Every structure is written in C-alpha cells, then in structure tokens.
UniProtKB/Swiss-Prot annotation:
The protein's name in its UniProt record: Asparagine synthetase domain-containing protein 1
PANTHER family attached to this UniProt entry: ASPARAGINE SYNTHETASE DOMAIN-CONTAINING PROTEIN 1
GO BP annotation list: adipose tissue development; asparagine biosynthetic process; skeletal muscle tissue development; transdifferentiation
Keywords per UniProt: Amino-acid biosynthesis, Asparagine biosynthesis, Glutamine amidotransferase
Active-site residues, Swiss-Prot/TrEMBL: C2
Limits of the Asparagine synthetase domain: 285-601
Domain Glutamine amidotransferase type-2: residue ranges: 2-184
Keyword Amino-acid biosynthesis: yes
Species, as recorded: Homo sapiens (Human)
Amino acid sequence: MCGICCSVNFSAEHFSQDLKEDLLYNLKQRGPNSSKQLLKSDVNYQCLFSAHVLHLRGVLTTQPVEDERGNVFLWNGEIFSGIKVEAEENDTQILFNYLSSCKNESEILSLFSEVQGPWSFIYYQASSHYLWFGRDFFGRRSLLWHFSNLGKSFCLSSVGTQTSGLANQWQEVPASGLFRIDLKSTVISGCIILQLYPWKYISRENIIEENVNSLSQISADLPAFVSVVANEAKLYLEKPVVPLNMMLPQAALETHCSNISNVPPTREILQVFLTDVHMKEVIQQFIDVLSVAVKKRVLCLPRDENLTANEVLKTCDRKANVAILFSGGIDSMVIATLADRHIPLDEPIDLLNVAFIAEEKTMPTTFNREGNKQKNKCEIPSEEFSKDVAAAAADSPNKHVSVPDRITGRAGLKELQAVSPSRIWNFVEINVSMEELQKLRRTRICHLIRPLDTVLDDSIGCAVWFASRGIGWLVAQEGVKSYQSNAKVVLTGIGADEQLAGYSRHRVRFQSHGLEGLNKEIMMELGRISSRNLGRDDRVIGDHGKEARFPFLDENVVSFLNSLPIWEKANLTLPRGIGEKLLLRLAAVELGLTASALLPKRAMQFGSRIAKMEKINEKASDKCGRLQIMSLENLSIEKETKL
C-alpha cells in the first residue's frame, strides 16, 4: 500500500518544488518504508509526483517509478490475480513494465481490465502529455481530487489535507473507470477536460451493459472549468464481475419455511438447510471461493522465513502479520476461521476489538431478555449464545467493559480457540474514552473521513481508526498486558452485508417490495459501495501504515454471489439471526462454528457503543458538525505527539 500524489500546475507563478506540509505528512503516514518526490516539467505545466510506500511484497520498490522515456507511475494496489506476480517480485514494477510497453490506449485499458485486486494509480505518459488515473471497480483504494485557482492547478492524492481552507475542496475520484487528462490541451484551452473510459460488461451475446454512473452524475459536483466527457474512441474497461442474478422463484418463498418463521434462531433450523444436496454444494462452493480470497490476502506479505527451530517454538514471541477487525459477529468469525487455514500455525493472529467507554457509566451492560424492548421474539439471543457470553465475561479481567461487541468478541474468541486450539489468538481489547475520541478525531481522524461528512461516517470512521491502530490490552495466560498490534495487513468483513442482505433496510425493502425489491436494493448497495465505505476505510486504516484487505469483495467471490439467485443467499421470511446472510451462516456451521452462526447483525456504531458517546438524537444521515476540519494553528498538537 502507498500514499500517492500528483500536483499539477499550469501557471509558472504557482510552480512549487514541494507539497504542502500537512499533505506530505498525511501521505507519509500511509507509506512508512520509503518516500520520494519527482518533478516533471514542460514549457507550460509542471507535475510534482510524491509517493510513500508500505512494503508488503517482493523487493522494496521506491516510487514514483520512471522509465527511460520519462513515463512516471504511482501505484497504490495489490495484484492478487489476473497478472502473474511471483512471490519474490514486486507488483508495482511488474505492472509498470507492462504499462510502458502499451502502444495505445486500448492496450492500457486491456491491461487494467486484467488486474484483480484493489488499486488506485497515477500514470504520466510523457510523449503524449497524458495523465491517467483511476480506482478499481469497487473503489477499494482511496483517490481524491481537488481543482483550484480557476483551472490553473489541480491535485490527485490518496488522502486530503487537515487545514480548513483546502479540506472542503477535496472529493473522491469516482470508481467509474479510468480518467485521462491531456495536459497540453488544457494549457491551450484553459479548461480541464477529463476523458472517461468507463467500466462495462460484455455478455456472451455481445450485449454491452452501460456504466451506472453517468457523465452528468460525475460532473455534478465539479467546478465549472472542469468537464467530464466520454472518450472519443468509445473504449471501455471490462467489468471484473458478472451482473447480479435478478431471477425470481416460481413459488412464493414463504411457503418453503412458513412453519419456522416465528421462532428464535437455533442451530437446528440451519441444519434443515444442510440436508438439501444442492444447497450443500452451493455452501461448499462459497467456502472454497472465499477461502481462496482470504488465502491471497494473508499470504501476500513478508514473513520471517529464516527462523531457527528454537525461534519457531517461541510462539509467544512471534509477531502477528495479520489482524482482523473483530466483533465476534458472523463476518469476522468466518474470516478468522478461514485465515487460520492459511496463516502458518506458529504465527499469532490479532483480533482487534474496539469499545467506546463513557466515563460516567460504571454499571456494565449485558444482554437482558426482558430489559430491552424487543420488536419481536426473533431478536432474543439463542440459549447457546447466552451460555457462551456468560462464560466469556466471567473470564475477562475487564468485566466492566461490556459493550455488545466486546461481549460477542469474547464469546467468539472462545469459539475460535475451540476450533483451532493450537493457534495463538491475540484478542486485543481496545478501550476508547470520550476524551481520547474527541482529541484524536479533531487532530487526526476528521480529515481522513472527509470528504464524507455524515454522522454515520463519523461513527464508523472513528471506530475503524481506533480499532486498526491496535493499541489496547492483551489477555494472556500470564495476565493482562498492554499491547500494540504491528500487523501490516488488516482484514475486514465489508461487503458481506451488502451482498447477502445483512442490513435491516434489506428486510424492510423485502417486506414492502418482495424479492424483486430486495434484488434492486442489493444491486444499489454494490453500485454505491465505493462512495459509501471503501475510500473512507482505506484512508482511516492506511493512516497507521497498515493495509485494509476485503475478502468479501474479491472479484471471484462477488461474481460467485452475483451468479446465485437471491433465495440461495438470504431468506428474509426467517427470523433475524438466520434469514439475513443465510448462506454465510450455513458456511459458518460447515466450518465448525457454533453460537456465532446465529448472531443477528449489529452495526459497528452500535456494537462498539460509539453512537452512544455524544449526541443521541442524531440521524445517521445528518451532516456531522464534529467533522469540521481544524485550523492551521492547531496542527502542531499531532505533530508534536505522534500516536
């Protein structure tokens, strides 16, 4: 992973030899292993490239990379498939070699159509004065742009600035395809014209599915001197996933399971589905494709390969290379179980569990069958889960910290220890006070969340930042000790809810518009995931010099799930804890998981209790005043005390 940036000026009076201090600082946070700047000048424009590398595979390759013809490449991504990269090779150099050999724009598009994995990039084509840039289909890597000085300059960057003046001008580059700017023409016309090469799907019948994001949608928030146009040759990138299966069942879904639609979730209900031969095949196919996705994401990183036998035996001293954002819910439990299959057994795995603690609260909160207002009896935790919660809470030294995700996390830890007792599972209890939340939101986090600006973005962005920082308490046999996770790779379960009808709004849509409406909701979820979640989470996690990886958004996983009819992925006639993400729950049972397979969805902002920390009368979609960017004079707080 890297922090990449390109600052372009079309006026000599704005030429600069360096980036603004706060932007450079933010980029270096993302890439602690090497930093380099490169200046490319023409008569009428100047490009300042800056790249900061987090080394994760092959030989450390300093960026920007430049070839003998003056082409410059900045790459923030991982090639997991599509283009062959050997274990000892660096994907930046491999991709740049291919890119340098491309003879025309069609070959460039074909190259990026083949890449599977998360990416954003900037490519300067010297001979033609073109600047190419873009993000992968899902937008798993951040890239922002801002245009200023009435078209005399613009900037592309993985992350924005902390200062109030520029902060509001940054916007996310849409994950709509590749963009190309003719720098020489821009100087002549005085207007910045972005040529778009969109994502399109070509069916076997040679029918082209148009990109969802229209040119007008992309242009809507841009300044008047910036326009987005379709590329003149009408070329495109091939979408890396198949379209969503919109098929509807011939018989009403309710008739298959009407006798169990009003009972609490139990393992026996899931076992009924496992007796179906076809369903069992689908479950195994899902496990296989998701397992491969996890394998790619936990093995593509450097490890200590030359340890002595004695060093291998000292597993308590071994460093975890992989961490998981861990609530103990179904998504993180399945990811952890599959990661255990592929990570060397002598290597610990960090489970990062975050809780927000209001100091004035001294009484623990627990699951209460009668104290909570239940909408229906389907929300009552299963008997099996309640027993596991009680056992896990009794063993914890931080018993007063009992927010929902901490309770389910402790119970999930016990499940994982039962499934894989030889593994060292580092359950990292990360407790955040109101004071720490407010201080670090102001000095470090708010600019990472922006340009997103809602209450929901604030809650999730802050929770993910503290969780991925990995500073907390480790409960070990010898007692409780302070701990900081140094794992460079952080796995997250984003994408499971969107594809498998995990959100409460999916159930609402199903109840009002049936399976057809549910299909449309899932299609909409996948279409907007790049602008809703992924850029924000990449910026937040990357700020710690760590890389977010998303197994549920692996291209092959998404294509597999898209190919299935909706009723094989979810059955919302069934109660919470079973019907949503049904396929994932069945996979969890097959993998040997128990109580966690029945946990209903709980959003991170509620499970971690960050939503209870401040104003409780806000709506998730409200603009969040707490995300206002700080002024220049306050920047020194973070610079003096780096956390």
